[in-house]
Amino acid sequence: MVVGVTMINVVPGEERSVYNELMKMGEIKDVFHVFGEYDFVVVMEVEGLSTLNKLVDQIREINGVTATKTIVGAEL
């Protein structure tokens, strides 16, 4: 399993619709609406890096999303 964390910026006023779209995606485990540099922090758990890449691409296609930044977790 691969854990990815994506920080998302959205168009002001589009937070609710972006949140609703994120919640429809099966691999997303948690969605946090945050204050500061980003609007959302999304935690994903997927089978591999290629699946993570596809999921992030789907997030970027959501109407209202302006930017994303993703980090990948590693086991110690």
Task: Label every PLM stretch briefly.
Residues 1-76:
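A compositional/biophysical signature of low hydrophobicity enriched in polar/charged and small residues
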